[in-house]
Curated annotation (Swiss-Prot):
The keyword Phosphoprotein does not apply. Pfam families: Aminotran_5 (PF00266). It comes from Haemophilus influenzae (strain ATCC 51907 / DSM 11121 / KW20 / Rd). This is Putative csd-like protein HI_1343. Signal peptide: none annotated. Belongs to the class-V pyridoxal-phosphate-dependent aminotransferase family. Csd subfamily. The modification N6-(pyridoxal phosphate)lysine is found at K146. Keywords: Pyridoxal phosphate.
């Protein structure tokens, strides 16, 4: 796994413009899967892939949401094929608080396609302890401010094999290893994705937050949140 610190606060969704098929019409018969019902979906996610599909000629396959706000797994399976390039999933809704069974969904995607999997963990990152290796997503993204950090930092983590497919979006210092009049050699991952002077103050502040979070009991915090939700249900007779 590698972690890239980016200056985009919308959870590093600009990876859509770093994928090699971002503007190639040869993917006109391929698809990108995403979830429906804007109440459940993060707008930054959906809009990003909608625009990408228009540029590269791909089709967006929208996954329906059941009455319990979970993705319809049967439709997910029927949507997947060898032409599915990527599936973008929301871990937790920023409106309903619904937590998708993200690990099971990824397992289904692996079983029925070769698609890349991108997880929006913005709303989950401060409430759920996430094991990246166990989750098996190709990409996972969130903003630092979603986990008590400073504004202005987008975090993109992923498998080395997946990140290696990304092409730099911005260009500048730090991202290069060697420069000559005729050739530029980009630095290794993740540095090739971190062009220009970084948000130094933000990174230092976020590092302090991460040190503090090492002492955080995510399991206890998650159980407390569940307890509060159950209490609300009882009081409002849901």
């Amino acid at each position: 796994m590698r972690v890239a610190i980016l200056r985009i606060t919308e959870r590093s969704w600009e990876i859509n413009t770093m994928l090699p098929w971002k503007s190639s019409k040869k993917f006109s018969n391929h698809s990108i899967a995403s979830t429906s019902k804007w109440l459940v979906h993060q707008v930054a996610n959906f809009v990003t892939w909608h625009e990408t599909a228009k540029k590269c000629g791909a089709k967006i396959r929208v996954l329906p949401i059941l009455d319990n706000w979970l993705i319809d797994e049967n439709v997910l399976i029927s949507t997947l094929s060898e032409k599915t390039k990527l599936v973008a999933l929301n871990f937790v809704s920023n409106v309903t608080g619904t937590e998708q069974p993200i690990k099971r969904l990824i397992q289904l995607i692996r079983k029925h396609s070769h698609a890349l999997v991108l997880v929006d963990a913005a709303q989950a990152i401060s409430h759920i302890k996430i094991d990246l290796q166990d989750l098996d997503a190709d990409f996972l993204a969130f903003s630092a401010h979603k986990i008590y950090g400073p504004n202005g930092l987008g975090v993109l983590t992923g498998k080395l094999t997946a990140l290696s497919q990304l092409q730099p979006l911005f260009f500048g210092g730090k991202m290069v290893e060697r420069v000559s009049n005729n050739r530029i050699t980009f630095a290794e991952l993740p540095y090739r994705l971190e062009a220009g002077t970084p948000n130094i103050a933000g990174v230092i502040g976020f590092n302090a937050v991460l040190d503090w979070l090492q002492k955080w009991d995510f399991t206890a915090a998650e159980q407390h949140a569940i307890s509060l939700a159950e209490s609300v249900k009882v009081r409002r007779n849901f």
